């Protein structure tokens, strides 16, 4: 996953 993606 890209480092700038945020996951809940």
From Swiss-Prot:
Keywords: D-amino acid, Hydroxylation, Neurotoxin, Secreted, Toxin. It comes from the Eukaryota. One of its GO terms (cellular component) is extracellular region. Its main location: secreted. Occurs in 2 forms which differ in the post-translational modification of Val-6. In the form conophan mus-V, Val-6 is D-valine. In the form gamma-hydroxyconophan mus-V*, Val-6 is D-4-hydroxyvaline. Both diastereomeric forms of D-hydroxyvaline may be produced. The modification 4-hydroxyproline is found at residue 2. Expressed by the venom duct. The modification D-valine is found at residue 6. One of its GO terms (molecular function) is toxin activity. It is found in: Secreted. Belongs to the conophan family. The mature peptide does not contain cysteine residue. This is Conophan mus-V.
């Amino acid at each position: 996953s890209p480092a700038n993606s945020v996951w809940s």
